[in-house]
Amino acid sequence: MTDSRIDFRQAKFLISAPDIAHLDEHLPGDVGVEIAFAGRSNAGKSSALNQLTEQKNLARTSKTPGRTQLINVFALDEHRRLVDLPGYGFAQVPLAMKKKWQQALGQYLQERACLSGLVVLMDIRHPLKDLDMQMIEWAVDCDIPVLALLTKCDKLAQSARMKTVNDVRKALADFGDGVKVEPFSSLKGTGKPKVLGILNEWCHPDWLVEALADAEQE
């Protein structure tokens, strides 16, 4: 059996779009596999993407949380993409803009058929805010698997880190096996192998594996 692991270091910028409608205009239809990354504006989403892909500037980090307003799409190969959704919930962003972003996020989760998994990034020191829970609930309602990624785990001692991880797992237990919880550090790479394993699994849904196998036989 050949190694089917995806090399996330091969991620390349594909497009930016202001909302789901424009995303549909730029992509070749709602096909293939997409894995989306969402989180509050100070959750370290861009840094996590850069660490996972081992690229310093794949996702641009900003000194001003909430600045990233676009949906940014990165191609892993011709069938698979990573989607960096706009950060949500930052206090200094105007209310009208917040509502626009939240509408776009909800629309994407509920309408994008090729969405194979959602990573919800949360600062481990401030997990499970209202909007985080809303994102998780939206995804679960749409039968989309979720990874609740507790970022900046290097900021806590090991005992405090594991307590928070266990507390979050208990809080999300009612969602069942569709929601996983893992600690992560963009600075030190803590948790990276486990996260990449989950993402790789999402990159290989049965229907895509079967379609690619059929294509090879033709």
UniProtKB/Swiss-Prot annotation:
Keyword Cell division carried by entry: yes
UniProt entry keywords in alphabetical sequence: Cell cycle, Cell division, GTP-binding, Magnesium, Metal-binding, Nucleotide-binding, Septation
Function: Necessary for normal cell division and for the maintenance of normal septation.
Residue ranges annotated for the EngB-type G domain, each copy included: 31-205
Record-listed Mg(2+) binding positions: S46, T68
Protein name (Swiss-Prot/TrEMBL): Probable GTP-binding protein EngB
UniProt entry tagged with the keyword Transferase: no
UniProt-listed GO biological process terms: division septum assembly
Gene this protein is translated from: engB
Lineage: Bacteria, Pseudomonadati, Pseudomonadota, Gammaproteobacteria, Alteromonadales
A molecular function (GO) term: metal ion binding
Binding site for GTP: 39-46, 66-70, 84-87, 151-154, 184-186
Gene Ontology CC entries for this record: cytosol
InterPro entries, per database record: G_ENGB_dom, GTP-bd, GTP-bd_ribosome_bio_YsxC, P-loop_NTPase
Cofactor(s) this protein requires: Mg(2+)
Family affiliation: Belongs to the TRAFAC class TrmE-Era-EngA-EngB-Septin-like GTPase superfamily. EngB GTPase family.
